[in-house]
């Protein structure tokens, strides 16, 4: 089972640079806005793409999607956990919670 992380804990880890943040949404929503430092990987991506984007299976990873009603984040987090990634957590409240708190978002150029 994947552990859930809070917004405040995730923000602290992003600030320290101690976590790989993974946006589980499709490419278009990711391009329009995403959490700082996030990479885009979806549950539909091939195993090769996942391995390319997340090569270190022991690295701390936090996965998020839209909000607690979206199944993309939990689905990807469970896939990573089952695939041998050893430190996967889920930011269940997602990008909507982050944005509602007024925290910074990035966009792809």
Model region roles, listed by residue range:
Residues 1-20, 24-63, 67-109:
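Rhodanese-like catalytic fold shared by cysteine-dependent sulfurtransferases
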């Amino acid at each position: 089972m994947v552990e859930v992380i809070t917004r405040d804990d995730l923000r602290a880890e992003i600030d320290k640079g101690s976590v790989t943040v993974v946006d589980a949404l499709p490419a278009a929503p990711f391009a329009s806005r995403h959490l700082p430092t996030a990479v885009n990987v979806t549950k539909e991506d091939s195993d090769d793409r996942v391995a390319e984007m997340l090569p270190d299976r022991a690295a701390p990873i936090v996965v998020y999607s839209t909000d607690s009603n979206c199944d993309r984040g939990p689905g990807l987090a469970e896939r990573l956990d089952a695939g041998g990634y050893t430190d996967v957590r889920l930011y269940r409240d997602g990008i909507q919670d982050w944005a509602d708190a007024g925290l910074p978002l990035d966009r792809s150029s």
